[in-house]
Swiss-Prot record:
InterPro entries, A to Z: bHLH_dom (IPR011598), HLH_DNA-bd_sf (IPR036638), USF (IPR051732)
Keywords, comma-separated and alphabetical: DNA-binding, Nucleus, Transcription, Transcription regulation
Function of the molecule: May act as a transcription factor which recognizes the CACGTG motif on SPEC gene promoters.
Organism of derivation: Strongylocentrotus purpuratus (Purple sea urchin)
Name recorded for this polypeptide: Upstream stimulatory factor
Length: 265
């Protein structure tokens, strides 16, 4: 692969020279070449080098290596993270203080950058782990290997887990059968029809008797009230008419005994 140089200018020209930085990234297909920062100024004055290379065995593995060279050290210290083919790792670089402010693109004095590495992205035994850039602080490290677990950063989960797939709800595979038994439906319909026919005949008989009563009772023919020829009105007048007939029969019996000269008992 060709070597590409990318220079990031982090501020206007009137800012202090300490805030300026240059990052040189080399992509190599074979070998283990380490490229240093040519500027030697700004936050990268501590000789922190970054190298991105693909594996030479043809398996299309991508290895991210961070090499830090001290002032009095001859052997650089490297932290390597290898991602196998078909595996997508999530890496977030946080720049800015943890006081509620949003991350900024400019390096500030006294701030430290942190990188988030999931535990599943690291292969045991290859020395994989999180790396911290900018101003190196002791104690902000993670043990290499599978026992190290995950390195969590202080930020919202939406920013850290950008590549996480959303949970999908499985579609319904079984359709509920709401069909009712045909034989039961036919039987219920027959029973309902029979019951309705019996009720209709009973109502017809009652209505016929009420019509006959309305013809016998004389007051029903001249009733012009709100009830009209209602069933309740006809039955009420029928009861009154029966009571009047009883009283008339009693009076007539008394008058007949008086006329015959027999005392009433």
């Amino acid at each position: 692969m060709d070597v590409q140089d990318h220079t990031l200018d982090q501020g206007p020209q009137d800012k202090d020279k300490d805030l300026e930085e240059e990052v040189t990234v080399h992509l190599t297909a074979d070998g283990d070449q380490v490229v240093q920062d040519p500027s030697g100024e700004g936050p990268f004055a501590e000789n922190i080098q970054y190298q991105f290379r693909t594996d030479s065995n043809g398996q299309s593995q991508v290895t991210y290596r961070v090499v830090q060279v001290g002032d009095n050290e001859t052997n650089p210290q490297a932290v390597v993270t290898t991602f196998p083919q078909g595996h997508q790792a999530l890496t977030q670089v946080i720049q800015g203080s943890f006081n509620g402010e949003s991350p900024t693109s400019e390096s500030q004095g006294g701030e430290t950058r942190f990188t988030y590495f999931p535990a599943s992205a690291a292969i045991p035994g290859d020395g994989a782990g999180p790396a911290s850039g900018g101003e190196q602080q002791p104690g902000i490290t993670q043990p290499s290997g599978a026992a190290g677990g995950q390195f969590y950063v202080m930020m919202s989960p939406q920013d850290v887990l950008q590549g996480a797939s959303q949970r999908t709800i499985a579609p319904r595979t079984h359709q509920f059968n709401t069909k009712i038994d045909n034989s039961r439906t036919v039987r219920d319909e027959r029973r309902r029809a029979t019951h309705n026919e019996v009720e209709r005949r009973r109502r017809d008989k009652i209505n016929n008797w009420i019509v006959k009563l309305s013809k016998i009772i004389p007051d029903c023919n001249i009733d012009h009230s709100k009830q009209g020829q209602s069933k309740g009105g006809i039955l009420t007048k029928t009861c009154d008419y029966i009571h009047d007939l009883r009283n008339s029969n009693t009076r007539m019996a008394k008058a007949s005994r008086i006329r015959k000269g027999s005392p009433s008992t």
